[in-house]
């Protein structure tokens, strides 16, 4: 190492000397003058000179032998002062003081140091200090006022660096790593980073990160080397990677893309993914999920049909239904609703081609022959359009039970439990007797039969119920109060007429066949089953009877009932008509006519039964719920086209 002055007795430092003992350099060359850098040598020299001055003062005034000893001591002290231990120096250098790297790229900051001797390993310390000024900002604004001021300061002082030379209190200072021997210790801020000190004193970053830009100082500390320059610095700037193309996928490069376009592309991709999930959900949606959860791609549909689901819930929970109360729930006798309109289970319908109406399936039969199930059209009900065709049971042309199930499903689809009310529309009026197959016995339910119509008298028997003449317009006919009629009570039913038969009518009953004007026994009037038949018999003058007894029966049923609110009440009960002052006298001719007809009916019964067998079809086979259930299960297993909604029914 170079020193200020080397050699003894020289000023230019060119002379050199060696110590006497080879292992201890106690007589190393020392400078003539000290410039304040070695304080220990200066203090030793001052003490030696003080002792020398004291010895000389004593020796001059003492014995000559003592003076010789003092001279030896003086020489020894002088030589010991000149031959003290040498002062070593250290020098630290950085080969490249300026580094610019890309983010996440490795970088190494080289640092080397030199010493006169290395009896012990020195301590290497790397420190981080932020820039006093931002180099990146100044590079993008070279015409700023601060840049102009820095340029003026650099021109006046060539060694001035405005980005490095500032107080540590105004910038960030951190210890990066330290090394002593082979042990490397990272600072608290850099724990977990791949940073190490390699070689002599090189600082190595495996990956740079944001915030690594700054000034890094390399310091070497040794207990033996007290002179020289033990510190140097290097600047590091970390830049982000910028290129003219954007690499979206590995090996795929695209041109520069705007930020707003990138956001739009991301939103569209998210929407497409959501739509794809919705479509897959609709395709794979189970039929047992909640009906109120709808798919986003098909909002008009849900996982299962709502109408069918609600009807099934009503059937299983026992809630009364306005469509078929006896089918969906078992009602108590107190809440028994009026019987719905039924389709008669009789012979073929007249007036239609083939004997069937337009809304009846000819090949379907739920209870055997004579039981026809109507098929609903889409135009029959206003709510039929709401039923989705995707959830209907596809009726099979070969299987009659599928038609029945289709009809029942159509009824359930039109069922709305949230709006109870009186039944309306063809769906309610088309109720057939299929709904009563599973009902309990009618004998176990308290019910009241229809009220019988009062018996008409002979005076107004010639007028039909459609006649405008009322009871008040009929003239009162007074009858004589004698005979057996005056002593007999009024008959309240047809069956009570047997007890009121007079002696004269018993014989007339046997002669009734001859009194009918030659009418054959096959076309005798049938036995009266109700009082409506008596009206038809009395109205024979207005409506002549045909030879077909069934036509007469249907004609009596097609006659509209009398309006109870009109003033034409045909009742003979004085309690029902308060305007009459008293009861009219009873006419016995009606009684005689009824008894005569009853006797002829008893004799004509065998012939009538033979005629009825010729008109009516044979009775259907007895219904068995077990057989029907077993056959229904077999048909369901064979039909693979049934949807899962049919199981709810």
Curated annotation (Swiss-Prot):
PTM annotation, UniProt: Phosphorylation at Ser-365 by MAPK8/JNK1 and MAPK9/JNK2 may be required for exclusive localization at tricellular tight junstions. Polyubiquitinated at Lys-638 via 'Lys-63'-linked ubiquitin chains; deubiquitinated by USP53.
Species annotation: Homo sapiens
Residues annotated with Phosphoserine modification: 365, 371, 389, 432, 436, 464, 467, 493, 528, 530, 540, 579, 631, 643, 646
Role noted for this protein: Probable role in the clearance of triglyceride-rich lipoprotein from blood. Binds chylomicrons, LDL and VLDL in presence of free fatty acids and allows their subsequent uptake in the cells. Maintains epithelial barrier function by recruiting MARVELD2/tricellulin to tricellular tight junctions.
Sites of Phosphotyrosine modification: 535
Biased composition (Polar residues): 502-518
The protein's name: Lipolysis-stimulated lipoprotein receptor
Any one GO BP annotation for this protein: liver development
Outcome after substituting residue 235 to G: Found in a patient with familial intrahepatic cholestasis; uncertain significance
SMART domains in the record: IG (SM00409)
Region span, Disordered: 1-21, 414-649
Gene name, Swiss-Prot/TrEMBL: LSR
Composition-biased stretches (Gly residues): 1-16
């Amino acid at each position: 190492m170079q020193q200020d002055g080397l050699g003894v007795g020289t000023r230019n430092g060119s002379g050199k000397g060696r110590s006497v003992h080879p292992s201890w350099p106690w007589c190393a060359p020392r400078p003539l003058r000290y410039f304040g850098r070695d304080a220990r040598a200066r203090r030793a020299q001052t003490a030696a000179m003080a002792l020398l001055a004291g010895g000389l003062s004593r020796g001059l005034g003492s014995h000559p032998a003592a003076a010789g000893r003092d001279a030896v001591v003086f020489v020894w002290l002088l030589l010991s002062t000149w031959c003290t231990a040498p002062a070593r120096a250290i020098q630290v250098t950085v080969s490249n003081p300026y580094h610019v790297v890309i983010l996440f790229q490795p970088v190494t900051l080289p640092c080397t140091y030199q010493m006169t001797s290395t009896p012990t390993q020195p301590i290497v310390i790397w420190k981080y200090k932020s820039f006093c000024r931002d180099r990146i900002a100044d590079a993008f604004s070279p015409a700023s006022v601060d840049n102009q001021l820095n340029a003026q300061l650099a021109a006046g002082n060539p060694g001035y660096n405005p980005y490095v030379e500032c107080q540590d209190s105004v910038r960030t200072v951190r210890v990066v790593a330290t090394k002593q021997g082979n042990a490397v210790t990272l600072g608290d801020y850099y724990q977990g980073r791949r940073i190490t000190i390699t070689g002599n004193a090189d600082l190595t970053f495996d990956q740079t990160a944001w915030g690594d830009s700054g000034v890094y100082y390399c310091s070497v500390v040794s207990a033996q080397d007290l002179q020289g320059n033990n510190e140097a610095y290097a600047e590091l700037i970390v830049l982000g990677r910028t290129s003219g193309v954007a690499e979206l996928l590995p090996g795929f490069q695209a041109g520069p893309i705007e930020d707003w376009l990138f956001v739009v592309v991301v939103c569209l991709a998210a929407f497409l993914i959501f739509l794809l999930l919705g479509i897959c959900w609709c395709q794979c949606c189970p039929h047992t999920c909640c009906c109120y959860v709808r798919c986003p791609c098909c909002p008009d549909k849900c996982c299962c049909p709502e109408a069918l689901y609600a009807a099934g819930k009503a059937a299983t929970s026992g809630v009364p239904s306005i469509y078929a109360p006896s089918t969906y729930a078992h009602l108590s006798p107190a809440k028994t609703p009026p019987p719905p309109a039924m389709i008669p289970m009789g012979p073929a319908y007249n007036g239609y081609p083939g004997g069937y109406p337009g809304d009846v399936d000819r090949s379907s039969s739920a209870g055997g022959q004579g039981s026809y199930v109507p098929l609903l059209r889409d135009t029959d009900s206003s709510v039929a359009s709401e039923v989705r065709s995707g959830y209907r049971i596809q009726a099979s042309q070969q299987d009659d039970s599928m038609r029945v199930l289709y009809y029942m499903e159509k009824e359930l689809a039109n069922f709305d439990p949230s709006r109870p009310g009186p039944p309306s529309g063809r769906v309610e009026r088309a109720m057939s007797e299929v709904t009563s197959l599973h009902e309990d016995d009618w004998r176990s339910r308290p019910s009241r039969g229809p009220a019988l119509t009062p018996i008409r008298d002979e005076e107004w028997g010639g007028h039909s119920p459609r006649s405008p003449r009322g009871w008040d317009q009929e003239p009162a006919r007074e009858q004589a109060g004698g005979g057996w009629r005056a002593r007999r009570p009024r008959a309240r039913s047809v069956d009570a007429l047997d007890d009121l038969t007079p002696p004269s009518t018993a014989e007339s009953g046997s002669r009734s066949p001859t009194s009918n004007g030659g009418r054959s026994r096959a076309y005798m009037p049938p036995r009266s089953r109700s009082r409506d038949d008596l009206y038809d018999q009395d109205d024979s003058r207005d409506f002549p009877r045909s030879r077909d007894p069934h036509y007469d029966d249907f004609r009596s049923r097609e006659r509209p009932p009398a309006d109870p609110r009109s003033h034409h009440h045909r009742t003979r009960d004085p309690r029902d008509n308060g305007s009459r002052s008293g009861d009219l006298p009873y006419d016995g001719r009606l009684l005689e006519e009824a008894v005569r007809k009853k006797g002829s009916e008893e004799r004509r019964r065998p012939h009538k039964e033979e005629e009825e067998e010729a008109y009516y079809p044979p009775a259907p086979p007895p219904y068995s719920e077990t057989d029907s259930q077993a056959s229904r299960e077999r048909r369901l297993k064979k039909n693979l086209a049934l949807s899962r909604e049919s199981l709810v029914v």
